Amino acid sequence: MKAIKYIVLILFGVISINVCAQNNNSERFAIKASAEIGLGNSISSNSYISSLSSKATTGSYGLDFGWTFWSQKGHRLEANIGVAYSPAAIELELGSFDYNYGAPATADMDGESYQRYYEISNLHQKVSLGRVTLPIYLTYGYKCNGWFGLHADLGVRFGFKTNATISEVSGEAYSYGIYPQYDNLLIDESYLNDFGTTNLANAGYGTPVCNGFSTSVLVGVGAEFSISKHLGADISVRYNRGITNLFKEQYSGQDFTNASAPINYSVSDGQQVKSLTDYLSSSKVSPLSLRIALIYRF
């Protein structure tokens, strides 16, 4: 968060220093309609479950509003603020993973407590996440000639969650129960307590627990091309370094219980699969993206 504060102070400091020197004839405004396409994996994540991995694709579609507050001999400084919708598709994979926990009487058709064992084979989840993002950034631009210029961007991006759902679940799990009170009797018959092999696509599943607010540092470089007197096109590459986590970690390193296990069972609800985002200790969206924009200057 200190990095965010320093960048914001720099942005406003530069504007304050130069605004007094601006010439009214050099004031220029811009409206920028843009689309960003994520390149490669867009999420950096960690989990205490070593076999849990994630990858994400992201995009962004929005409008930015720019104000050129200083220009001289082809150089310019521009302050920008925007609003965009930024969807993300996050895929989580839990590879071969075994665990057990103490199952209560509510997890047995005969009301017995026992030790429940799971052997998971490649549990896959896809999470759909939507955010409204507000980029605030400073642009330094240099116009090389009458129709072509280069620029660099530096700023921050704030994100606000709009929706988060698990849109897809697949995989298999084998489960069985051991009953210590019956001389460690092992039961894996499917007619009792959903033991045996289960297709997880048919199980119930939870909802990702997200942070409502996220921040990232924005940097970028690009080129702007003039189409007409007021209209231009921009192609740039941007990198957003996530500062805050997208998801709230719910379980961290403790032994599994009926409440915290990735898959659990009760007689009333059947097999229930938790969102794998519950087990992410770090989940920062950090996309490298290609940005294409249409710019109207006036």
Language-model segments: what does each one mean?
Residues 1-28:
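Cleavable N-terminal export/targeting peptides
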Residues 22-70, 210, 284-291, 295-298:
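Short glycine/proline- and aromatic-enriched beta-strand/turn motifs that initiate or cap beta-hairpins
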Residues 25-33, 73-79, 130-132, 146-152, ...:
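Outer-envelope beta-barrel architecture signal
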Residues 40-56, 88-130, 161-214, 246-289:
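Extracellular/periplasm-exposed beta-strand and loop segments of Gram-negative cell-envelope proteins
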Residues 117-121, 134-136, 142:
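Short acidic (Asp/Glu) patches
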Residues 215, 222-224, 231-252:
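Extended, basic/helix-rich recognition subdomains
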